[in-house]
Regions:
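Extracellular/periplasm-exposed beta-strand and loop segments of Gram-negative cell-envelope proteins
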Residues: 33-40, 74-84, 89-103, 136-146, ...
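Residues on the lipid-exposed face of transmembrane beta-strands in outer-membrane beta-barrel proteins
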Residues: 47-53, 67-69, 108-116, 129-133, ...
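Short glycine/proline- and aromatic-enriched beta-strand/turn motifs that initiate or cap beta-hairpins
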Residues: 8-52
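Predominantly the C-terminal beta-signal and adjacent terminal strand-loop region
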Residues: 11, 153-186
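Outer-membrane beta-barrel transmembrane strands
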Residues: 98-119, 125
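Short loop/turn motifs that connect adjacent beta-strands in outer-membrane beta-barrel proteins
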Residues: 9-17, 54-61, 117-125
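Transmembrane beta-strands of outer-membrane beta-barrel pores
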Residues: 24-30, 67-75, 114-116, 131-139, ...
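Residues that define the transmembrane beta-barrel architecture of outer-membrane proteins
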Residues: 16-18, 39-45, 102-108, 123, ...
Length: 186
């Protein structure tokens, strides 16, 4: 029998906060002309995945990068058309059944992430901030008149859209605020 001190390496924590996200939001035009009025319940939803890459020993700071899908549907009172490289918006005077703008994009979020989590503490506070790069897939206008006539228009987008994001939350719930740095339309 041998008696002596045992020496072992302390195991480093290995947890990370990889995230599968699903969000529902209310989109709002912050700089729309006075003639554009949002109506009904406009909505946006997104889903995706963010890979967490801790950058300190405590694993309380991390960088996140992900991939997702984003769609916003904004009900409003304007008929949007595209002709001759020009988008025009006209207030609909005679009524309509349904009228909206729909924007769909592929999103790549880049985040700086803070949390007060440990390897065994699963209910914790978090703040994530960063940008998401959006690659527009579709930008269109849809209008249905009271007689049932349907008008659609594919609208050109400016290309890549940058969006500032701030997410804060506790445990499984987050509140998010986002702002596009440039308009979608050309």
């Amino acid at each position: 029998m041998v008696v002596g001190p045992l020496i072992a390496q302390e195991e480093a924590p290995t947890f990370r906060e990889d995230q599968i996200y699903l969000s529902i939001a209310y989109p709002y035009f912050s700089d729309a002309p006075n003639t554009l009025i949002q109506n009904k319940l406009s909505y946006a939803f997104s889903f995706g995945f963010v890979r967490d890459m801790p950058i300190n020993k405590q694993r309380s700071l991390a960088v996140g990068i992900g991939l997702g899908y984003d769609q916003a549907t904004i009900y409003n009172n304007n008929l949007f058309t595209y002709a001759g490289n020009n988008i025009s918006a006209t207030v609909i005077e005679g009524g309509y059944q349904q009228n909206y703008l729909r924007m769909q994009s592929l999103a790549v979020p880049l985040e700086l992430r803070w949390r007060n989590a440990t390897e065994t503490k699963h209910a914790f506070w978090r703040i994530h901030t960063g940008v998401s790069v959006h690659f527009p897939m579709q930008f269109k206008s849809y209008n249905q008149t009271p007689t049932g006539q349907i008008n659609t228009a594919k609208l050109p987008s400016k290309g890549t859209i940058l969006r500032l994001n701030v997410h804060f939350g506790f445990n499984t719930w987050n509140i998010s605020i986002a702002h596009d740095l440039q308009p979608w339309a050309v």
